[in-house]
């Protein structure tokens, strides 16, 4: 019998090797699930299926896991390395697990009595044939069931490329024995837990059934809230309710997604081709925390930063290949053009207008549609910045979608809602040339199919893409901690007292968590180093030395536990960047060696990639700048200076450190600079280390332009503390534009009005204005004293000269 079974498996191997692709989830289970290769493993499959076993074994061997067909040899006993939970034709038709499976569990538990160092790892595994959730009112059981031979053959042909093997978090038998004992009841408990786990796993991979679009529309149009809005629309426009209802249907049709599973499969193949054409791979980190949320039944809201139109596609592609359900995505109405609008809609996009202002019917329908998505259990994605960042920095959050998300929770959403911040990064952004033109004043080109094709056609070899899932925010937990009154059954007017504050606070925390999940790449680091040189050029040796300094700093003084730092050597990073197309980096040779420099037109483009990680280096840059300009300074004075500037940096760059953590952070920075010999530290005195002064100069450059902007605004206020806010913003912008021309500053955000507006708001929040809006010059002088020391005399004179000219006008 045993040999016949082996022969049968061998017969299955040949066709399945051609038809079914290896798709393990996660892709590196040993590392991502923290499995211990020195301890035995036992794989648990949901039901008896030799086909599934063959596919599962193939995936095991491809990722370096022990062969499931081999035995575990423990204390002279030879025990199976895999078990099937259920024998039935349908998923878990029988009430209990297979008796032989219980016996195997019992034997493993008994061995834990004999060996105190033994810790068998029980690993639930399931094979997913396709990921279609089906449609509402569709008959049939979930797809996690034993298929007949013919059904399996059809599934292998049709879903072979979309078959996934899902490895779950291991259960420690040692933990089970220590906590619950080792009698036979524990074996049955293990089996029950595994059954529940497999059911949850299937739902987390496919999501709820897809809606019947027409039935969903009818339900929404019959809701009291939308009916009231329709009646108000009819009265306001003096039209019949029937006509207003037709308008409501048009709005719903404009907004709503029309998800099609087969469309997703086709899109997956197209996207696989696209990534292979454009990029050298997609690096994904921390997907396990999202899989855990899905298994625990959370409603997941993905909130990524917005770098490119391709973000929409990238995140859905990544989630699909991480065994998660692609979300419904809030996309700008500008993307609803032929033919991609229909493709996006079938892939889960629902479209949103740029503004809801003055259109109550539209805003009501959109809000109710979003609430319905939450109610039905669909994951949702939206870009909290509202649009793509043209500068590479995070934009101030637009809170409308977050407000509607919180409203859905307050309306009685039963499942917990967790917001997952997502950092998306690229070594080359498709639209970066367009961004540079727009920042120089060119009109934004309207999206259309021709534009998309032109962009894709001319680009290839763009390096890597990065997706890092940040620390989730479970809304109910956040509200319990910060706004405990949220559970009280209050009227909308009373709720507004804390509701708006909560929306702003959560939105800000999302931005902070996105920055905490930054994925640093070779382009970010190389751009940062070259832009730190006034000539945008460094010798090859200087550049490699600076790259190594950045890399070691991020490894030894990590910004957060979620940050991703390149592991390649500086030489390999530079070699990689030079091989990419359209980066604008040139290598020249002279009698002394090689010089690496930026092309004249590439400096603005490179600031985009520097700005992606500017928040990681702004504090060490400030410390370096203070030491460089003072030449020798006591550590307490450095801490004092940093503490005065930090509130503005924290607000502008969404920094994560609290004021209580700031001193420790600065001390860690100083310790690392001393270790790298960038500075010298004698007792409490910090000073320049002359042999490494060039490195200190490069480190200090990261904050230079930010401090110059602060100095502009503060200097205007010192001249006239009563300057109206609108004039203050306008004059600050004018001075910055002049400074950028005279001193060759290429950073596109340097004279951005929004940046000055945010700084002025921070000044107000920190108490630098009185109730009448008059600046407190005594308090401003504290900042000026610091800025006067760390900004060059030449720049200070240019700023003061420009301000004097404004006063003359």
UniProtKB/Swiss-Prot annotation:
Motif HXXXXD motif per UniProt: ranges: 306-311
Entry's Gene Ontology BP terms: CDP-diacylglycerol biosynthetic process; fatty acid metabolic process
Subcellular location: Cell inner membrane
Catalyzed reactions: sn-glycerol 3-phosphate + an acyl-CoA = a 1-acyl-sn-glycero-3-phosphate + CoA
Pathway in which this enzyme or protein is active: Phospholipid metabolism; CDP-diacylglycerol biosynthesis; CDP-diacylglycerol from sn-glycerol 3-phosphate: step 1/3
Membrane topology, record value: Peripheral membrane protein
Family label: Belongs to the GPAT/DAPAT family.
Entry protein name: Glycerol-3-phosphate acyltransferase
Name of the gene: plsB
């Amino acid at each position: 019998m045993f040999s016949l079974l082996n022969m049968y498996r061998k017969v299955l191997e040949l066709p399945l090797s051609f038809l079914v692709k290896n798709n393990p989830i996660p892709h590196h289970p040993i590392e991502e699930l923290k499995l211990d290769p020195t301890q035995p493993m036992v794989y648990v499959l949901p039901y008896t299926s030799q086909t599934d076993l063959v596919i599962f074994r193939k995936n095991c061997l491809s990722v370096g896991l022990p062969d499931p067909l081999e035995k575990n040899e423990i204390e002279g006993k030879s025990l199976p390395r895999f078990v099937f939970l259920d024998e039935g034709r349908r998923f878990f038709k029988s009430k209990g697990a297979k008796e032989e499976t219980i016996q195997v569990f019992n034997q493993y538990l008994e061995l834990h009595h004999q060996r105190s160092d033994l810790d068998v790892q029980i690993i639930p595994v399931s094979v997913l044939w396709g990921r279609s959730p089906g449609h509402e009112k569709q008959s049939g059981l979930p797809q996690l069931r034993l298929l007949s031979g013919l059904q399996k053959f059809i599934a292998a042909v049709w879903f072979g490329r979309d078959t996934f093997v899902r490895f779950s978090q291991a259960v420690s038998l040692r933990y089970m024995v220590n906590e619950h004992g080792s009698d036979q009841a524990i074996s049955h408990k293990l089996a029950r837990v595994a059954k529940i786990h497999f059911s949850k796993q299937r739902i987390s991979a496919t999501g709820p059934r897809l809606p019947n679009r027409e039935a969903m529309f009818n339900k929404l149009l019959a809701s009291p809230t939308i009916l009231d809005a329709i009646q108000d629309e009819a009265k306001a426009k003096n039209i019949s309710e029937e006509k207003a209802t037709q308008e409501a249907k048009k709005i719903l049709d404009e907004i709503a997604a029309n998800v099609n599973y087969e469309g997703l499969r086709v899109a997956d193949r197209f996207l696989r081709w696209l990534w292979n054409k454009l990029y050298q791979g997609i690096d994904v980190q921390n997907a396990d925390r999202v899989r855990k949320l899905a298994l625990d039944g959370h409603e997941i809201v993905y909130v990524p930063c917005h770098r490119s139109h391709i973000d929409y596609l990238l995140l859905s592609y990544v989630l699909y290949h991480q065994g998660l359900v692609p979300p419904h995505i809030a996309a700008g109405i500008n993307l609803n053009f032929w033919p991609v609008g229909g493709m996006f809609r079938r892939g889960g996009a629902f479209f949103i207008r740029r503004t809801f202002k003055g259109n109550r019917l539209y805003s009501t329908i959109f809000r109710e549609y979003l609430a319905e998505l939450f109610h039905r259990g669909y994951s949702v994605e939206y870009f909290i910045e509202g649009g793509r960042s043209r500068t590479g920095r995070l934009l101030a959050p637009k809170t409308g979608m977050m407000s509607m998300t919180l409203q859905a929770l307050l309306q009685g959403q039963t499942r917990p809602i967790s917001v997952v911040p997502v950092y998306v990064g690229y070594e080359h952004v498709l639209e970066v040339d367009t961004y540079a033109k727009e920042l120089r004043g060119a009109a934004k080109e309207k999206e259309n199919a021709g534009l998309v094709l032109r962009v894709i056609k001319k680009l290839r070899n763009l390096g890597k893409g990065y997706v890092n899932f940040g620390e989730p925010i479970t809304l109910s937990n956040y509200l319990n901690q910060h706004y405990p009154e949220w559970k009280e059954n209050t009227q909308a007017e009373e709720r507004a007292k804390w509701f708006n504050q909560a929306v702003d606070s959560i939105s800000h925390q999302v931005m902070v968590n996105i920055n905490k999940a930054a994925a640093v790449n070779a382009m970010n680091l190389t751009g940062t180093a070259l832009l730190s040189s006034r000539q945008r050029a460094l010798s090859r040796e200087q550049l490699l030395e600076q790259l190594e300094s950045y890399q070691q700093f991020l490894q030894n003084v990590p910004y957060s536990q979620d940050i991703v730092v390149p592991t390649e050597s500086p030489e390999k990073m530079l070699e990689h960047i030079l091989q990419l197309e359209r980066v604008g980096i040139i290598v020249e040779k002279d009698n002394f060696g090689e010089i690496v420099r930026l092309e004249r037109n590439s400096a603005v483009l490179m600031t985009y990639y520097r700005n992606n990680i500017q928040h990681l280096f702004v504090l060490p840059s400030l410390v370096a700048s203070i030491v460089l300009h003072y030449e020798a300074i006591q550590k307490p004075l450095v801490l004092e200076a940093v503490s005065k500037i930090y509130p503005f940096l924290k607000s502008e760059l969404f920094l994560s450190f609290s004021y209580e953590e700031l001193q420790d952070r600065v001390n860690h920075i100083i310790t690392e600079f001393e270790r790298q010999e960038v500075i010298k530290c004698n007792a409490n005195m910090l000073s320049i280390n002359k042999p490494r002064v060039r490195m200190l100069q490069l480190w200090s450059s990261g904050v230079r332009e930010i401090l110059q902007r602060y100095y502009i605004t503060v200097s205007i206020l010192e001249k006239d503390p009563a300057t109206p806010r609108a004039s203050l913003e306008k004059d600050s912008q004018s001075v910055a534009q002049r400074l950028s021309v005279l001193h060759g500053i290429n950073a596109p955000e340097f004279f951005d009005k929004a940046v000055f507006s945010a700084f002025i708001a921070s000044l107000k929040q920190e108490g630098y204005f009185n109730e009448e809006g008059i600046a407190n010059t005594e308090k401003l002088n504290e900042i000026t004293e610091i800025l006067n020391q760390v900004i060059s005399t030449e720049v200070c004179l240019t700023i003061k000269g420009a301000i004097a000219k404004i006063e003359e006008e």
